Amino acid sequence: MEQTTVEALRSSPFFSGLSEEDLERIAEMGEPVSFGEGETIIEKGTSGDAMFVLLWGTTELEAGGRVHKPGAGQAVGEMALFSKKKRTATVTAGGPVEALRIPAERFHDFLLQNPSVAVGILEQVVERLREVQDRVEAWYG
């Protein structure tokens, strides 16, 4: 089922807890983009200047020899918004994909003007880091 941009943002764990008004403002700063099956959305090793929120369709994210399949409502490339490091994964369209491209520069400006939103996003980033830490501890004891 196709989601509206705000619905996709609302269902994204990355944006959970944000107000409807904030979600609408983020949706307005984004640019709708389309990808065909097999098309590269994000390429490992490249500089990241934007993140993508998937509106519909499925993708294949390959990192560290593992393949994940993010779908509607999920964000990909979000770490590029906070790091000057190269992309760590390749994301390709598993079929037709519609996404919202959120440029890093616009998103940074938005966060500077809205510190409470920045704190909410930071909480989500910290939660993801904790999940990764838990997995590493489970693998290596």
Task: Place the predicted regions along the sequence by residue.
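Cytosolic regulatory regions built on CNB/CRP/Popeye-like sensor folds
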Residues: 1-141
